[in-house]
């Protein structure tokens, strides 16, 4: 829902896009999926036996995605401090994975306090794309495991190559998220 997620002061900022120059709000509408696109994802994944889920960026999107009955939800790092959104995803009764990029330990603790530990997964992340190895801070996985010993702790990797992801698993990450793109211009 771009009109809810894009700050108003950014709506009319112009930018170059694969479709030419346009305002940021128009660009967001171009790249957002609607019912038809999500229905196609759902159909394809069901045919292939793939479980899929989404990161919702606002509360109406949680309600929208619920019609596809995802097995879980994922909160993007930028949403960690949006406790109302986290609660909306948690209220579905499905597991919720939260990413921690750009967050302080206090912000992580506040989010966990707001939604509770039940059906929660926490992913250590950095929010640099691509992330240099010197900024990965994989030791945070151990810190999170000590802080939340009964909670699955994972790793969300945004770096080139797979070695850091393998290292994250070796030091205890029990799930991973990887970002993949077919077109860097989008």
Regions found by a protein language model. Give the residues of each.
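Catalytic cores and adjacent flexible loops of soluble metabolic enzymes
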Residues: 1-186
């Amino acid at each position: 829902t771009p009109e809810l997620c894009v700050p108003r002061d950014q709506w009319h900022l112009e930018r170059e896009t694969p479709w030419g120059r346009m305002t940021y709000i128009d660009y967001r509408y171009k790249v957002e999926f609607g019912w038809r696109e999500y229905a196609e994802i759902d159909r394809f994944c069901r045919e292939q036996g793939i479980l899929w889920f989404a990161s919702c960026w606002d509360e109406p999107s949680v309600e929208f995605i619920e019609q596809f009955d995802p097995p879980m939800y994922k909160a993007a790092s930028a949403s960690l401090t949006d406790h109302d959104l986290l609660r909306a995803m948690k209220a579905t009764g499905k597991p919720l994975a939260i990413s921690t990029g750009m967050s302080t330990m206090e912000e992580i603790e506040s989010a966990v306090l707001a939604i509770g530990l039940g059906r929660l997964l926490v992913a250590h992340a950095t929010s640099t794309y691509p992330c240099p190895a010197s900024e990965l801070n994989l030791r945070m996985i151990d810190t999170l495991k000590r802080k939340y010993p009964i909670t699955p702790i994972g790793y969300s990797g945004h770096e080139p190559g797979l070695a850091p992801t393998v290292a994250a698993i070796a030091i205890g990450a029990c799930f991973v998220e990887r970002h993949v793109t077919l077109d860097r211009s989008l």
